[in-house]
Amino acid sequence: MFDRLEAVEQRYEKLNELLMDPDVINDPKKLRDYSKEQADLEETVQTYREYKSVREQLAEAKAMLEEKLEPELREMVKEEIGELEEREEALVEKLKVLLLPKDPNDEKNVIMEIRAAAGGEEAALFAGDLYRMYTRYAESQGWKTEVIEASPTGLGGYKEIIFMINGKGAYSKLKFENGAHRVQRVPETESGGRIHTSTATVACLPEMEEIEVEINEKDIRVDTFASSGPGGQSVNTTMSAVRLTHIPTGIVVTCQDEKSQIKNKEKAMKVLRARIYDKYQQEARAEYDQTRKQAVGTGDRSERIRTYNFPQNRVTDHRIGLTIQKLDQVLDGHLDEIIEALILDDQAKKLEQANDAS
């Protein structure tokens, strides 16, 4: 581990030199790439340097114990050694996490797709609740949201809503939201007070740049039509809505949120690119996933990952056994406690895999 950390520190110092090189400064691509690489390494290097400093302080403190000291001073040194040893241990654990392989998509923007599943209109209302929850969370992080496509229902819910979240690190925090979300509550239309169970599915996809997913224009069929509102009525007499069909994969994306056909096509292309990337990624992992499922059970998107229980004001994430009695706050966008727990769980699993492999 420490050989790797030395190599990381050397690379970081080399990047500092490169970023002062006039040839690099005058080359926007190199400047951008080297700056990003340096930023990615910075936390690891600073943590490693703190670790080395603590080690030096620890050695000096232990050396002091070899000298003749007054009893009071000796106790102070022993106390300092205890604190330094605790700090050293914490830094080692942090460095182990920092050296874990990074998800290359973590810093990307996100395309989120929420769809009402079992439960009819109640499921559509819940899809709307989830949409508001994620947009409020995005606001708390300083991220921007933009609706790409929406199919609203008459009571204020959504059969489907697709939206973009623009912000640094958005995918790293929201990628754990993939799956089926379940709600338990008494619908407003329920006169008998019975609790109903409904579900909505969430897909979180990293936004892909054109260079990352090559799409041949001849493989895309473009259809245009007039935009429609709830119930199917036409709300736009111009042919501004766009439907893109990727012929090789059969993936279809529709966008009618903008009044401009060009803007609708641009938005649809972003979603199409992300879905194609996701499909190829799933196919590439299929063989590995099959082996893993046989060993530890399934973990695909169709499984229930979280339950939102209104009568008990409770949220339970079934993957990590986390229960929070703050449903009202969670739906208002306070997702940090859940997301941080999921990130820690993911890191723990990766550390376990790394230890098994070593």
From Swiss-Prot:
Task: List the GO cellular component terms.
Answer: cytoplasm
Has UniProt tagged this entry with the keyword Cytoplasm? yes
At which residues is N5-methylglutamine found? Answer: 233
The record, for SMART domains, names: PCRF
Molecular-function GO terms, alphabetical: translation release factor activity, codon specific
Record's InterPro entries? PCRF, Pep_chain_release_fac_I, Pep_chain_release_fac_I_sf, Prokaryotic/Mito_RF, RF-1
**PTM details?**
Methylated by PrmC. Methylation increases the termination efficiency of RF1.
Q: Which UniProt keywords apply?
A: Cytoplasm, Methylation, Protein biosynthesis
Where it sits in the cell: the answer is: Cytoplasm
Q: Which PANTHER family match?
A: LD18447P
Q: Which NCBIfam families match?
A: prfA, PRK00591.1
Q: What family name appears in the similarity comment?
A: Belongs to the prokaryotic/mitochondrial release factor family.
User: Briefly, what is this protein's role?
Assistant: Peptide chain release factor 1 directs the termination of translation in response to the peptide chain termination codons UAG and UAA.
* The protein, known as: Peptide chain release factor 1
Q: Which organism is it from?
A: Geobacillus kaustophilus (strain HTA426)
